Every structure is written in C-alpha cells, then in structure tokens.
Amino acid sequence: PYTTLFRSATMADGSKKTVTGYTCSPTTMAANTTAVTVSYSEGGVTKTTTTPVTVTSISNTLASNSWATIRAVSDAGKGSNYWSVGDTKGITINGKVGATTFSNLAISVFILGFNHNASREGSNRIHFQIGKINGTLVGLVDGNYGNSTSTTGAFTMNTSYTNSGGWNNSHMRKTVLGSNSTSATSPAANTLLAALPADLRAVMKPATKYSDNTGGGSDTASYVTSTTDLLPLLSEFEYHGARTYANSAEKNYQAQYDYYKAGNSRVHYKHNATGTAAYAWCRSVTSGYDYRFCRVGTDGGAGTGYAYFSWALAPCFF
C-alpha cells in the first residue's frame, strides 16, 4: 500500500534519488494505525522517518459507518465504490419543527444518487432523502395535514394563497425546513434542519439547486434561478423525470434522481400512519397559477396543491 507514497531519498550531496528496497512498518494499516515508519539503507547507512497517518475503516454496509466516514468517502468522490442507490442509514429527528414537535422519531435516510447533476449542483456529494420507516417511503406530516392554514410553522409552502417568491422565499424553505441556513451547524431555530442529529449536521454540505424563484403564475424561463440549499424538497422533475406542471425551464437545469429513475415507488406514506398514503410537497412552483406548488400524489403521480395547505415533507440533503 506504500508504493506510491515513498519513492525518493535525499542523498548526502543534496541530490534526490528514486529508491526501492525500503521497508515500512507496519506492513498493512488498520483502523488503530496512527503512524508509518519507513527505513532505507545504502552504503552501510540506514535512515528512518516516521509519518503520522489517519486510517479510516469503511464498511460496505452504509448504516455501519459514522457520518464522518461517509463524509470522507463523499469528499473523495468514492461513494459508489462502497454503497448503492437506495442504501439506508438510521437517524433520529428530535425537536420542534415549525409548529410541530418530534420526540425522538426514528427514521432512515436513503441514497438518492451519487454526484447527482454535479456540474450544476456540486461535485463529491452523496444525495440522501428523508426518509423511510421499516422500509416504507414516508413524508413528515403535522396536525394540519390536508387542511388550509395560515399558521406560521405549519407544513405549508406559504401561509397565504400565493406562490409569489417561488421556492427561494417560501415559508417552507425558510421557516419549516431551514434549508436557507448559512451553516448546518448553526441552523435556524425550530426548523427541521435544527432537529437533525448533530453528527449528521456536522458533515452536511450545501448544494446549488435550480427552481422557479419568482412564481406569480407565469411560465417564464428567466424565473428559474439558483439557490444554495442544505435541506430542500425535491422538484417535480427530480421525482418524475418529466415536466407536467412546473415551470417548463426547470428541467433544463435539473436531473431525475437515480433512485426514482430506477422505477422505485414515489408514493409517500404518513410517518405516523405508514399504511396511509400522503400527498408530498415539491419545491417547484406550478406554472400558470399564482397560488399553487407541485406535489406528488397519493398514487405517486405528478400533481399540484394550494400553497397554504399542509402536505407531507420529504426533503433531501447532501
């Protein structure tokens, strides 16, 4: 394992020489290895140097790895060498999310794709979605599910009858999810981001997402712009691989997630009633209407909903 690490020696006259025949100790590295010692002898002279190392043990079972290890693999762009789309890892959601309190909700996150749409969204990222419970795709719901409400912190896209401001300025993005937070380690209070485990938040990366960020009922290409997000909802195209109701220009900047491209079900179920299918919000504005956003139907198909109705949440992170 050291053949590419130690290849040259500095001679007495200051010249450098490519060498072979050196020895290394230990000969193989384990998780508890903290240093490597290299020795080289020539002309009766032996020189020894010790180099500190950090060894990370990586399991092919995603759930067996710490979030720090997953981040290290992600940074190296090697996630697909170890894990597969759809692999899961459990987390606990705990705290107040908008106007709803979650008390140690056990839920699994799963891999949507590796280096998804990297040229636009950022490279060396593993995209995850929240989540699954006992293998069932779920969305988080609140007590207002299926109803209109102006309550701040309800799981609505906005607190009034409008999609003005699009995804960027939505109540969902800022007040409920905290996706616009400057840092995952300093999340806005009472948001879903703040309710995620600290070890996960410590390694989360932002991504550049494209969406209609104007709204107002016009299918205008220039309305599709970028935002920097930590915990966004998926777009219509990221779910379905086709545009039905969203701004027709969104698809030019987006890609369908591999998990859904593979044919996996898009039907979400309520996190607190996993036998009941739920409508789930998308971040895409419904073009042609100034008061709707896209959503995934209880049959898994594309649909739309009034901005001030409460539906399920299933955001992603990176």
Regions inferred by a protein language model and the residue ranges of each:
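Acidic, Ser/Thr
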Residues: 7-12
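Collagenous Gly-X-Y triple-helix signature in extracellular proteins
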Residues: 58-318
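Serine/threonine-rich, repeat-prone extracellular segments and beta-strand-based repeat modules
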Residues: 15-47, 51
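Interdomain boundary/hinge segments at the C-termini of tandem beta-sandwich modules
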Residues: 51-57
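Short, small-residue-biased leader/transition segments that mark boundaries at the very start
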Residues: 2-5
